[in-house]
C-alpha cells in the first residue's frame, strides 16, 4: 500500500507549507486568541511546544496510507510515463477506461483531449501526461489538507482542554514562566475536570493559610542564605536546644526504688490490703524504698541567646530536589492532614518554578511514594491528595528510605522534609548516626515541619532546622485574629 509520504515525494508535493498554514490557522482561532490575551504565560508555553506539534504532524502524514483508487491511478501514471507515443496510443483506451472506473477527476478532461484532436501527436502525449500529473498533485494536496484539517480539529480540542486545565491550576502551581512551561507539559495527560478540582480545593485552602504558604516558601528558598559576619551587625535572638536532666518520661528503662505512687509495681500496691504489712508499706514509702517502674527520657528545652546577625548577604546557591516525607498516622488526620497536603502542594509550586524534583513519601505501616515533578505530576498529585491519614507511625522506616534514596547520584544534593506531629518512638541509634553522616559528609539538609507543639524533642534534635506550624485550636485562633 502506498503511503502519503511516498506519494508526496513522487509528485513533489511539499507538506511543510501546509503544516505551517495549519498551525497558523490554529493559533489565530478566536478561542485561543482570547485565552492568550488573558494568560501570556500560557501563550509562551504553547509557543515553546510548536516544534513538537510540527514533528507529530509530519509523523502522522508519513504513516497514513493513500486510498486504493488514488494508489492505482498513480501506479498507472508511473507506467504511462515509460511508454513511447506509439505504445501510449495503443494503451490509451485502457487508460481512459481505468480513469472512469476509478472516478478520477481527470477522466472527463482526458476524454476531451483525445476527442478534440484527430491525431495523437508527441506534443499531445506530453500535454496529456502534464495535465494528468497536475490532477494527481491536486488530489494529493486535497488529501493532505483533509488530514491536516482533521488533525487541526483534534489538536484544537486538545489545546482547549489543556488550556482549561492549566488556567484552573495556574493560580495554585505557577510562580513564573518556567513553572508555566512545566504545567503545560504535565497537562498532556488524560484528566477529567473532577480530578484536578481536588488540587484547586487544596490550593484554596492554602490561600486561606498564608502562614503555611510563607513557611513553605522560606523552607524552599532556605539555601539562598550565605552567612557573612560583620563587625557592626545588629543583635538577633538565637535559639538552641539545651539538654535537661531526665525528668520527662518517655519509655520504661527498668525498676528502681522510689516513692512514686503512680508507678508502683502491683505486688507493692497489694501490701496495702494486708493489715500486717500496712505500716511496713508506709515506712518504705517514707524512706523511698518502694519498687517502682523507672521511666526515663531525654528532655530538651529551647534556650534563647543574643548574638550578632550573621545572615547579612544573600548569594544564590544550587538547590537540590525535595524528598518530602508525610506522616499519615491517625493523629495527623483532620486539619493536620489538610495542612500537610497543602504544604506539599506549596513545595510542588516551588519545585516547578526552580526546576527541582519533588518526591513525596507517605510513611505509616508501609511507604507509598509519588513524584510531583514528573511529566505525570498532576496525576501523581491527585493520587497523593486522595489519600487518607489513618495509619500508624513508623518514622524509622521513613528515615531508612530517605537514606537509601540519597545514595543515588541524582539525589546527592537533596533536601529532606519530614512533616509530622513527631509523637512517635525514639529513632534507633543506627538511623541517627547515618543521618548525621549524610549531614556532615554530603551536606544533606534535613528539615522538620512540626504540626504539633507536643512533639518529642529527642526525635527532632537530628534536624538541621525545625519549622513549627502548630495546628492546635489556640494557635489557629491566634493566627486568624492576627490577620
UniProtKB/Swiss-Prot annotation:
Pfam families registered for this protein in UniProt: VWA_CoxE
Alphabetic keyword roster: Chaperone, Cytoplasm
Covalent S-S links between cysteines: none
Domain of life, source organism: Bacteria
SMART domains to which the protein is assigned, alphabetical: VWA
Primary localization: cytoplasm
Signal peptide limits: none
Xref: CDD domains: VWA_YIEM_type
One cellular-component annotation, GO: cytosol
Subcellular location: Cytoplasm
Family affiliation: Belongs to the ViaA family.
Subunit structure: Homodimer. Interacts with RavA.
Stated role: Component of the RavA-ViaA chaperone complex, which may act on the membrane to optimize the function of some of the respiratory chains. ViaA stimulates the ATPase activity of RavA.
NCBIfam families: PRK10997.1
Name the UniProt record assigns to this protein: Regulatory protein ViaA
Organism, scientific name: Escherichia fergusonii (strain ATCC 35469 / DSM 13698 / CCUG 18766 / IAM 14443 / JCM 21226 / LMG 7866 / NBRC 102419 / NCTC 12128 / CDC 0568-73)
Designated gene of the protein: viaA
